[in-house]
């Protein structure tokens, strides 16, 4: 009887203590929490509490569990808990062109192969299934936010939201008939409707995406920028990617691509500039002063031999530099941002002949908090801090390539792979648990991708 009384007393105390806890919808526990906050705090046995789509607490597991109760607990099993990765530049529907005509120059790839292939194959359904395939691949490697430029971008938005991903999605402006719009007037009308539809959405940020200064007239560039600013949207554009682009701009405009964009009123703190390879000291100063974000795409730049972005100098100038995969066709055949971290660091080291040129901690930042700064979303994502969106990637340390671990950042940048990502949470919702995708029908997506591979080959007379 005495034992029963004691047990009852303990139970009452437990219930009382439990009742005093704050509620959370989800707690991620038993992980090494790499916050990427300004202090770069790491909790060796940490936890993250989530309410709704946002983080309400980050800290030692014992403290979080003492203060919060949650309806759902995700066990990190001693692995890493990171901010979700940010793919700052890609063309996701082009997953369905993966491997189509590699090992050619960018100019030949665009004009001889891809533009004709797009004219014959790209429609809403192509974009729909390409986006589903790209979303599956990105989630599997820990990407929670991506910046896209393509056609039928409203379809990309629908599928991105259905997958539970966060997207900054740009409708392409280009000075020749595109698969979805055959004139600038049609492009403007489509894009304005697109911007209106997605304004205020929790996951989707719609944007105009003038392709580049070599495919868009001054008027097209200015019209796209004006539309973006009317709706307080970002502007996505390729900038100074090729030497020929820089040479032509100097010859035709008397100035560099960066200076030209500034001269015509496009450059600004709302611009996300992909590549930024051919940028000298004056260009870098201008980019920093304007608050323009740059996105480094090492795999792409290496694959098409377009050049090496001066990332250490850009960062030293105060430019926010993120990472992107580009591709996923022709310029890079995968969407694994962890691979880009590894390559970015090593590419900087070898080109500068300096092993200190760009370190592991630098490239992890470029994939997270600096990537968020580059796409002007650092107040919402990029680090595990109270008030930010609950976008997390949980990475296993139970594979041969993951042990032993002496330095967390070096392990992430140089040892771990996208395939080591186990669980992904976006906006407080689990979209992949224990490597199983929860928002996408992966077998069906793979089946459709194979079908598209056959139809694309047939359309180009490759069979």
How should each PLM-predicted stretch be described?
Residues 263-270, 312-400, 413-417:
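His/Asp/Glu-enriched, well-ordered alpha-helical/loop segment
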Residues 86-90, 146-147, 167-170, 206-210, ...:
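Hydrophobic faces of well-ordered beta-strands that scaffold small-molecule active sites
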Residues 147-150, 207-223, 302-305, 374-376:
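Active-site glycine- and acidic-residue-rich loops that bind
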Residues 3-12, 17-46, 50-61, 67, ...:
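Active-site microenvironment of metallo-dependent hydrolases
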Residues 20, 155-277, 284:
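Metal-coordinating catalytic core of metallo-dependent amide/deamination hydrolases
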Residues 96-129, 166-185, 243-270, 290-293, ...:
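Active-site gating loops and adjacent loop-to-helix segments of metal-dependent hydrolytic enzymes
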């Amino acid at each position: 009887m005495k034992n029963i009384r004691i047990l009852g007393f303990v139970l009452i105390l437990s219930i009382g203590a439990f009742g005093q806890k704050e509620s959370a919808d989800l707690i991620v526990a038993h992980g090494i929490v790499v916050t990427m906050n300004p202090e770069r705090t790491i909790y060796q046995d940490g936890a993250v509490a989530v309410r709704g789509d946002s983080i309400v607490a980050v800290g030692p597991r014992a403290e979080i569990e003492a203060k919060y109760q949650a309806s759902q607990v995700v066990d990190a099993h001693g692995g890493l808990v990171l901010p979700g990765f940010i793919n700052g530049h890609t063309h996701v529907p082009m997953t369905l062109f993966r491997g189509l005509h590699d090992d050619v120059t960018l100019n030949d790839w665009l004009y001889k192969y891809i533009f004709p292939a797009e004219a014959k194959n790209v429609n809403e359904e192509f974009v729909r299934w390409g986006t589903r395939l790209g979303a599956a691949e990105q989630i599997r490697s820990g990407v929670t936010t991506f910046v896209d430029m393509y056609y039928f971008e409203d379809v990309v938005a629908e599928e991105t939201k259905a997958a539970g991903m966060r997207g900054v999605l740009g409708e392409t402006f280009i000075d020749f008939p595109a698969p979805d719009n055959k004139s600038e007037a049609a492009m403007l009308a489509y894009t304005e409707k697109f911007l209106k539809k997605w304004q205020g959405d929790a996951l989707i940020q719609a944007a105009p995406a003038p392709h580049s200064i070599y495919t868009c007239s001054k008027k097209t560039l200015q019209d796209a920028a004006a539309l973006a600013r009317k709706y307080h949207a970002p502007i996505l554009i390729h900038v100074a990617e090729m030497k020929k682009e820089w040479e032509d701009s100097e010859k035709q405009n008397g100035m560099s691509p960066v200076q030209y964009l500034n001269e015509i009123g496009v450059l600004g703190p709302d611009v996300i500039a992909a590549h930024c390879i051919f940028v000298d000291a004056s260009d870098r100063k201008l980019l920093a002063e304007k608050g323009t974000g740059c996105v480094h795409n090492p795999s792409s730049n290496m694959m098409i031999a377009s050049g090496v972005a001066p990332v250490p100098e850009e960062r030293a100038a105060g430019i926010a530099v993120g990472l992107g995969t580009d591709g996923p066709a022709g310029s890079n055949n995968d969407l694994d941002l962890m691979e880009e971290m590894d390559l970015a660091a090593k590419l900087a080291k070898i080109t500068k002949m300096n092993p200190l040129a760009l370190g592991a901690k630098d490239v992890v930042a470029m994939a997270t908090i600096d990537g968020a700064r580059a796409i002007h979303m650092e107040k919402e994502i990029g680090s595990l801090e109270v008030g930010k969106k609950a976008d997390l990637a949980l990475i296993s340390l139970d594979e041969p390539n993951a042990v032993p671990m002496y330095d967390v950042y070096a392990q992430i940048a140089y040892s771990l792979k996208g395939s080591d990502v186990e669980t992904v949470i976006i906006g407080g919702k689990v979209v992949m648990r224990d490597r199983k995708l929860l928002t996408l029908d992966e077998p069906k997506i793979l089946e459709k991708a194979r079908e598209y591979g056959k139809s694309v080959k047939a359309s180009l007379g490759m069979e």
